[in-house]
Amino acid sequence: MVKISLILPLLVLLTLSLTLAPCSCIAQAISKTADGFDLPVAPPMGAGFYKSRGFRSGGHLGEDWVTDGGSAKGFRQPVHAIGNGIVVLARDIHVAWGNVVIIRHAWIENRQIHFADSLYAHLDKINVREGQQVGKGQQLGTIGTNHGMYPPHLHFEIHKDLGIGVNHAAGTRDLRSYWLPTDFVLARRHLAGGGRNVPTPAANFLLPTTEHPWYLGRFWHSPKKSTHPKSSKSSASHRSSSTSQKHSSSNKWKVNRYTDP
């Protein structure tokens, strides 16, 4: 009789293979190097927004941005590219993500070319297409709720590992694979060598095809009033409103069985 301990890993691998599909989103392309980076809401420095939830290794691998005075006021507010780059993903991923845009950036630092992906999730609308060149500050879409799953906010990540896409299991869940988003921007507000044409690596991501077990296992939870803990002020000294104001519309926006990625 085959031991259960041997069967379970095989079942997990089979399930993963059935619920993830490769996406050759764009081939290698030429894009312009960044001349600096801004925050993705109310650029350059996010005036009128605050960071309601920050990065935590092994947990929340990005930042959540909402408007001062309550998340409802941020619904359908513009979301902007943090810097020059090329759109490598722009589609509705469903599950815990909803509408997602990922931009691949190149920049010159210490005389070397570096690359990173910026991710913008839960959008209400997407205004760009895959393969499109974008400039710093260009509108990518609008703040949304992931089809009513969350209170309105922008989930924002920056990836060192260009293979992650929307599959957090593709990299280490810590600063080996991710940048602290606000710190990344503040350290690179102005860069030399912007506007140069450089070859950008192709984007080959694994995307969920149905309801990936990564969401249904680790992130399953019972419905709560809000998926967001108490806010913390960002290093950019963004204003924060009182606890009573944060996500004041949580009764209006349905909070589903998923937590924010």
Specify the residue positions occupied by each region the protein language model found:
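Positively charged n-region of N-terminal signal peptides that target proteins for export
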Residues: 1-6
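Short, flexible loop/turn elements at secondary-structure junctions
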Residues: 43, 55, 69, 107, ...
